[in-house]
């Protein structure tokens, strides 16, 4: 199995397109660093306490006029009070962590590139006629397909590491740490309480959570590639869902509770850490179960059909 994975890895990196994708990711990070360095405000705000106190006073005034706003404003007021009490500025200037946080948006690029690899890794074997050469080896079809899927996962992980480590290094070079302890703290509001998190740990979790959507769509692209033997179909359909899936699901969720069973209602796990679930009543456990169900269905279809297919035709 390890030799199969190694061979698949060599195949991927023998193509110029793979290096072009890595180059695009690197240039995007560097370009964004220059833009952020040019437009961002580097100085911290020395009047942050007064501004937070004024904001809280305004929010409490609005709550008094309209009590229905209380639940919506409670988190902001609690976080502001915690910052004031523990001397944790809300604005420490643009630091390495600010840049790494903003760079998390580029996980859509890592997802896109992983989908392209996933969509072609099986279909191209059929298109190029090399699938028959794989079949004459003393290996099971399951081993062959599993090695390809593991290679897709490893490639996606590599891109994620390049993005995370690269953005951290670029952030340190361009923006520094900010020189304040507060810049290394992330606050989370959960169940009426404020929790302090190490910024590095928070960002690592954020990057992994942001990649869940890409993982699921890449797995679907892999399934489509194995089932239909058409990389164009797999790429086009998967990219469309990656870009539009979450937005379309949000529209449906606004009207129907059954939207919680849709894949894209569950891929954003950060909604249970930093925000509010898309649909009331959804939990982290529920989303993980739904993701596991979709994941198993995609792989069962991919392996089930591939293992029964007549390769000669």
UniProtKB/Swiss-Prot annotation:
Name the domain of life.
Bacteria
A GO term from the CC aspect: plasma membrane
* Species whose genome carries this gene: Bacillus subtilis (strain 168)
Q: How does it sit in the membrane?
A: Multi-pass membrane protein
State the signal peptide span: none
UniProt keyword terms in alphabetical order:
Cell membrane, Membrane, Transmembrane, Transmembrane helix
Q: Which GO terms describe its molecular function?
A: ABC-type transporter activity
What name goes with this protein? Uncharacterized protein YhcI
């Amino acid at each position: 199995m390890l030799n199969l994975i190694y061979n698949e890895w060599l195949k991927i990196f023998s193509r110029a397109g793979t290096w072009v994708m890595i180059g695009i990711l690197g240039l995007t990070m560097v370009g964004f660093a220059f833009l952020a360095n040019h437009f961002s405000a580097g100085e911290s705000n020395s009047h942050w306490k007064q501004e937070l106190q004024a904001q809280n006073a305004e929010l409490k005034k609005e709550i008094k006029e309209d009590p229905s706003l209380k639940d919506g404003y409670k988190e902001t007021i609690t976080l502001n009070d915690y910052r004031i009490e523990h001397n944790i500025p809300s604005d420490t200037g643009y630091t390495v962590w600010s840049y790494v946080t903003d760079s998390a948006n580029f996980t859509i690029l890592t997802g896109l590139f992983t989908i392209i690899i996933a969509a072609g890794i099986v279909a191209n074997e059929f298109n190029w006629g090399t699938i028959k050469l794989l079949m004459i080896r003393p290996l099971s079809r399951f081993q062959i397909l599993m090695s390809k899927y593991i290679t897709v996962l490893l490639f996606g992980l590599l891109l994620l590491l390049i993005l995370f480590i690269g953005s951290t290094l670029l952030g340190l070079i361009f923006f520094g740490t900010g020189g304040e302890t507060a810049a290394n703290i992330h606050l989370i509001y959960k169940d009426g309480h404020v929790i302090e998190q190490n910024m590095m740990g928070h960002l690592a979790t954020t990057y992994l959570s942001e990649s869940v959507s890409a993982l699921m769509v890449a797995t679907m692209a892999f399934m489509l590639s194995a089932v239909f033997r058409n990389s164009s179909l797999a790429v086009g359909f998967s990219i469309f869902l990656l870009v539009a899936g979450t937005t379309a699901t949000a529209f449906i969720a606004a009207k129907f509770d059954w939207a919680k069973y849709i894949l894209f209602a569950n891929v954003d796990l950060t909604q249970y850490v930093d925000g509010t679930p898309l649909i009331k009543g959804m939990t982290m456990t529920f989303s993980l179960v739904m993701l596991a169900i979709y994941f198993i269905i995609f792989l069962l279809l991919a392996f089930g059909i591939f293992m029964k297919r007549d390769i000669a035709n």
